[in-house]
UniProtKB/Swiss-Prot annotation:
Bifunctional enzyme that catalyzes both the deamination of dCTP to dUTP and the hydrolysis of dUTP to dUMP without releasing the toxic dUTP intermediate. GO terms for biological process: dUMP biosynthetic process; dUTP biosynthetic process; nucleobase-containing small molecule interconversion. Pathway: Pyrimidine metabolism; dUMP biosynthesis; dUMP from dCTP: step 1/1. The keyword Nucleotide-binding applies. GO terms for molecular function: dCTP deaminase (dUMP-forming) activity; dCTP deaminase activity; nucleotide binding. Homotrimer. SUPFAM superfamilies: dUTPase-like. The active site is at 133 (proton donor/acceptor). It comes from Methanobrevibacter smithii (strain ATCC 35061 / DSM 861 / OCM 144 / PS). It comes from the Archaea. This is dCTP deaminase, dUMP-forming.
Amino acid sequence: MAILSDKTIKEYLEEGKIVIDPLKDEQQIQPSSVDMRLGDEFKVFKVIRKPYIDPKDEEDIAEYMESSTVPEGEAFIIHPNEFALATTQEYVKVPDDLVARVEGRSSMGRLGVTMHVTAGYVDPGFEGRITLEISNIGAMPVALYPGQRVCQLVFETMTTPAELPYGHPKRNSKYMKQLKPESSRVKLDYELKK
């Protein structure tokens, strides 16, 4: 696997092989990645009277979360030990012969804010806004602003195009074409349906 350079990223964007929309300015394209901006919708867990979340539970996990939209110019405050779901402003299409990785920007990491807990991998064929699993592991609350560059997308080549890319009818592509933060759909995983 090879990581795409800024030159190749620009070529693929011009050809439409990679789609990042909107790409507000060329400064988002870094030497080997593309800076992604924070969207304006967030989901956080509600305080509920339940001892734990069971992925096999028929109750929808979405019921344990509440959504909010942050108006332009205002901030979403993430407190220490808090977790929130958000998305990038940009809608992304990854071709069948590339994968992408979400990496936090070091400027955010130095504040104690991570942009993905475990799902930093974007499959070939994915299309939609990238989900961010934001955590504050620092000691102070941090203000996050919609439109702020918070992470970067790194593209890597594959040895061959995927035979069954994300979104293929034979795949269980639970988050294809998502536009806003989506709660976990883990209960749809085939091994939990048995």
